[in-house]
Amino acid sequence: MKIITLTTDFGLRDYSVGAVKGAIYTKCPDARIVDISHLVSPFDIFQTAYILKNAYKHFPEGSIHVIGVDAERNPEKRHLLMLLNGHYFIGADNGIFNLLAEENEPIQLFEVATDIPITLFPTLNVFPSVVEKVYKGLSPEQIGVPTDKYLRATHFNPEVSSDEAFIYGVIIYIDHYGNAVSNISRSLFERIQQNRKFEVIFKMFSFRKIYNQYSDIINFNCPPESRATPDGEGMLLFNDLNYLQFSIYKSDRRSVGGASSLFGMDYYDRVSVHFF
């Protein structure tokens, strides 16, 4: 029994998610459908890639991943099936596929052959038929035509100054807690740092310490009754994906706020690290 995942920008209010699931169950009654996210910002393939890339690896090989973001077919945007690390991905040729793969990671792409006319809702009217073919064991070559031509979206890669005194990055994701994740990886940070001191700068805010985990901000040497509460304090750490992350300890976007709101951070805002 293969697992089928859904990643879309449909939200949870409308009929769309339920309709897609119904169409898939009609064709694959014993399937297991897993929702990865339906709250992707509309048409944002970079946000889609961050979520799906870091989720799919935890599913068993052979899983089928449906990408319902910016999926409408047109003369310049085909529907593709990708085979990557034993996983199948179905979506539109909008730049998403190379974002899902690591640098220089081999991928196989197939243009999906379909006699279904252009539709406003391909995730419902086209993709379930492709899912069915993969689910029932057809090879990618039986489903589509191999192609090496596809749209390559530009990665938001951090930049290092020529004297290696600075790393310049951007915010690539804001999560449910308001944590703002940059594209600066731990490996890049440590390679450039070389045991030097550092200052992480965003607008008027600066940080000179990176914590290993959230609770490290608590002074456990101080008795609880006389200990200052760190709730709502800003902090830096490398998240579980090893990207530099701006956080608020025990953030609640409804009360104390998250890093994105309190620091005024938004997608693709610039951050820098100064080594000295």
Question: Where does each model-flagged region fall?
Answer:
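Structural motif
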Residues: K2-T5, A31-V34, S63-V66, H79-L81, ...
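Short, basic/aromatic-enriched C-terminal tail that caps enzymatic domains
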Residues: I3, F263-F276
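Anionic-ligand-binding alpha/beta catalytic cores of soluble enzymes and soluble regulatory domains
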Residues: I118-Q194
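Active-site histidine-anchored catalytic micro-motif
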Residues: I3, K27-D30, D44-Q47, P60-G62, ...
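Short acidic, Gly/Ser-rich segments with clustered Asp/Glu that frequently serve as metal-coordination loops
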Residues: F10-D14, E72-P75, Y177-N179
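Alpha/propeptide regions of enzymes that mature by internal proteolysis
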Residues: M1-T8, Y15-G68, H274
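A conserved acidic, glycine/proline-rich C-terminal tail/linker
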Residues: N183-M265
